[in-house]
Structures are given as C-alpha cells and as structure tokens.
C-alpha cells in the first residue's frame, strides 16, 4: 500500500516495521531474512506501472500478495541455508517441508490483497487533503 502511494519513500515504513519486529521478537537468526524479503515485495510493486487501471489493480495486487506468501519460504531459504550450513538439497527439503505453511500464508495474503486497492484510494485521498 505504501509502495503504491509513496514509491521509494515506502522503504522507511518497511524498515521501521522490520526494526520493530526485531525489537518485539528478538534480533535472532530468524530476523535476518526480514532485511530482504520485504524489499523484494517492494521491488516487485515498484515494477508495476503507476497509472494501472483499477480493474487490473483489483486482480494484480491480490495476486502479488498471494505469490509473496507462497514464495516466502523460497525467499527465506537461502539465508537459512547459509546460517545453518544446508547444502542445496537440504535447502530444497526445507522449502518442501514448509510448503503447507506457505500455502496458508498465500491464502491469507491473497484475501488481504483485496484490501490493497480500497486502502490505496483512502490513503491517496488523505494525502491530497
């Protein structure tokens, strides 16, 4: 939502969120992939055209949210492999083992993604006051 409205400036709330998550949950090894997984979502969103039609946005935003949830384990896996000494096969096994959770993550993100367009409209309206 912030990336669609604020573009590059959205990195500020992203990393404030990452910092708060670390403060709340502890700056342990699980936190390290947070430093880049959210930036990947930001980058994908930045690649979308600015003037995207609402009819397209209503489908694209939930799909991107769902894909990010589905691929979260894949995005997380390289850091886990490096931190825990997994070889490529071990990393793939870790991804496959987490896939049921990624499916749940994708489903939740897909549903939440339908809120993106209405919330973007509200935020843009508030910005132009």
Where do the language-model regions lie?
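A generic structural signal for ordered alpha-helices
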Residues: 1, 10, 18, 22, ...
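Generic transmembrane alpha-helix motif of multi-pass integral membrane proteins
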Residues: 1-11, 43-48
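Transmembrane helix irregularities
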Residues: 4-6, 24, 107
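Transmembrane-embedded, aromatic-rich helix segments that form part
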Residues: 12-15, 35, 114-115
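Interfacial aromatic-anchored transmembrane helix boundaries in multi-pass membrane proteins
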Residues: 16-51
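Membrane-embedded alpha-helical hairpins and interfacial helices in multi-pass inner-membrane proteins
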Residues: 28-33, 47, 54-129
């Amino acid at each position: 939502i912030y990336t669609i409205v604020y573009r590059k400036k959205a990195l500020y709330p992203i990393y404030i969120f990452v910092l708060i998550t670390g403060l709340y949950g502890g700056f342990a090894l699980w936190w390290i992939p947070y430093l880049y997984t959210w930036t990947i979502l930001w980058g994908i969103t930045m690649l979308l055209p600015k003037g995207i039609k609402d009819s397209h946005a209503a489908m694209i935003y939930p799909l991107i949210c769902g894909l990010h949830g589905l691929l979260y384990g894949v995005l997380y896996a390289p850091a886990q492999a490096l931190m825990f000494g997994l070889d490529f096969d071990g990393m793939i096994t870790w991804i496959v083992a987490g896939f049921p959770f990624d499916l749940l993550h994708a489903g939740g993100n897909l549903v939440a993604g339908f809120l993106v367009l209405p919330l973007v409209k509200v935020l843009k309206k508030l910005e132009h006051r």
